[in-house]
Structures are given as structure tokens and as C-alpha cells.
Regions:
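Non-cysteine beta-strand/loop elements that form the S-adenosyl-L-methionine
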Residues: 1, 37-38, 121-125
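Active-site mouth loops of central-metabolism enzymes
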Residues: 2-20, 47
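A short, mixed-charge helix-start or loop-turn motif at secondary-structure junctions
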Residues: 5-8, 40, 149-151
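Generic anion/oxyanion-binding catalytic loop in active/binding sites
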Residues: 8, 15, 24, 171, ...
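Short, acidic/polar
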Residues: 14-30, 75-82
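Active-site groove signature of glycoside hydrolases
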Residues: 27-46
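Beta/alpha (TIM)-barrel catalytic core signal, keyed to glycine-rich beta->alpha loops juxtaposed to Asp/Glu
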Residues: 43-235
Length: 235
């Protein structure tokens, strides 16, 4: 898989020129003439531009058997809906919105994607580092915009989510549980009916092993029952 719209040379440039250059550059770096999927990556406030020249290029490359599937990775569910409505999307990637802290796409993107047989990628199940195991903290020294862009709302850089994340971590820590186990297994139980995957985003082998361990550790039913009683969340 590769993506368009994210290279520093053409960041969030969804023109025909930028899209074509990005694809050619990715294929060159990957030393391939075919990829299974390409995602339109990260439009922030405008969904129409990516669905014009950029999508046209991807559809053309797909027709020429250069790529297998077309997708979009973006935060807003209304952007997912608009993309799915084109009839050209095979995949939608969402992030931060099916976690222990937020399940908003369970009522928006997931039902629509299932109805239209569009694959779902659920990203950031650990909400950055907030649900990764260590005590949740936000870097108060990091300068943030007064109005967070959509991609950062509810993220590890959003002070609004820290209190609940810390309460969940403390609840687990008091019981010798790892919050990461619950976070990963909750995401894996998302109601995608076999038509989706969870993208954890490990940056090294150690993190990969930690995620695998959390996915396969046994979490007793009574733990989920108690967690639901405390936070209203369960599998």
C-alpha cells in the first residue's frame, strides 16, 4: 500500500500533476509496477479537491491494472460519506474514532461502509500513547494551535481527552492490568463484520511484539464487566 497527498514536495496537493508524481515516485522507491492499494491521505478541510483530479488519476491507474484498490484516509465521517458516494472507494481509513475513548464512527462510517461493501481500516486504537501502557501524559511544553485541526482532536495532543484516559489507566494499574490489552482487544471487536482491519502503527519490533501480546493476552469477562460498570465501555 502507498498514499498520495503526503509527500513534503506536494503536501496536500491533490492536483493531477502532484498525484501522478507521487505515484511514480512511490512505485520507483518500491521497485514495483503494481500496488494493492493507494490511499488519498489527509485532506483537512476540503474533500472536493481530492475527489476531482486526484481521484481521476487513481481511477485511471486502476483501470490500467497499476493498482488494485482506491481508498481515503481522513478523520471526518462526512468526508468518508462523500468519498464513498463517488462509487470509486474500496477502502476508508479512520483514526482515533473507534477506541476506548471514542466510538463515534460506529454510528456513521462503519454502517455506511458495510452497506456499500467498502473496507474499513481503524487507525490509532491506542490514541497515540495515551492507551499504550505508560501513564498518560501530554507534553505541556509543546505549542499547539488554539483550534486543533480535525486530525488532532481527541489525539494525545488534545488536553480534553487526558482526564478520561488517565482514569482508565489508573483503573487498570490498580488491578495489575495493562490498559493496552483492553484497548487493542476492544478495537479488534469493532463491528466491522469481517470487512475491516485494525492499524496499530508500531514503529519498531518491540512495539509490534507488545501489540501482538496485548491482542492475544486473555482478558477475563469479569474485567470487561467491571470496566463497563466504571466507564460504560465493553466488548
Amino acid at each position: 500500500q502507498t498514499k498520495v497527498g503526503s509527500h513534503p514536495r506536494f503536501l496536500r496537493d491533490f492536483s493531477k500533476e502532484a498525484t501522478t508524481w507521487s505515484l511514480e515516485n512511490s512505485f520507483k522507491l518500491l521497485r514495483t509496477d503494481y500496488v494493492d492499494s493507494v490511499l488519498i491521505h489527509g485532506p483537512r478541510y476540503d474533500i472536493e479537491a481530492p475527489l476531482q483530479e486526484c481521484l481521476d488519476v487513481l481511477v485511471d491507474w486502476k483501470s490500467k491494472k497499476r493498482l488494485g484498490h482506491i481508498g481515503i484516509g481522513v478523520r471526518q465521517p462526512e468526508f468518508h460519506r462523500r468519498a464513498i458516494e463517488t462509487g470509486e472507494m474500496d477502502i476508508v481509513l479512520s483514526f482515533l474514532d473507534y477506541t476506548l475513548l471514542s466510538q463515534s464512527i460506529a454510528k456513521t462510517t462503519i454502517p455506511l461502509a458495510l452497506e456499500k461493501d467498502v473496507g474499513i481500516i481503524l487507525g490509532s486504537p491506542l490514541t497515540g500513547s495515551l492507551l499504550a501502557g505508560p501513564e498518560p501524559k501530554i507534553d505541556v511544553e509543546k505549542e499547539l494551535p488554539s483550534d486543533l485541526p480535525p486530525s488532532l482532536i481527541g489525539s494525545k495532543l488534545d488536553p480534553a481527552v487526558l482526564p478520561v484516559a488517565h482514569q482508565m489507566w489508573k483503573w487498570c494499574d490498580d488491578r495489575d492490568l495493562n490498559i493496552r490489552d483492553l484497548a487493542i482487544q476492544f478495537a479488534l471487536q469493532a463491528p466491522v463484520e469481517g470487512n475491516g482491519i485494525v492499524l496499530t502503527g508500531p514503529s519498531n519490533l518491540k512495539e509490534f511484539d507488545e501489540v501482538y501480546k496485548s491482542a492475544t493476552n486473555e482478558v477475563p469477562k469479569n474485567v470487561w464487566q467491571d470496566f463497563k460498570h466504571a466507564f460504560g465501555i465493553s466488548i
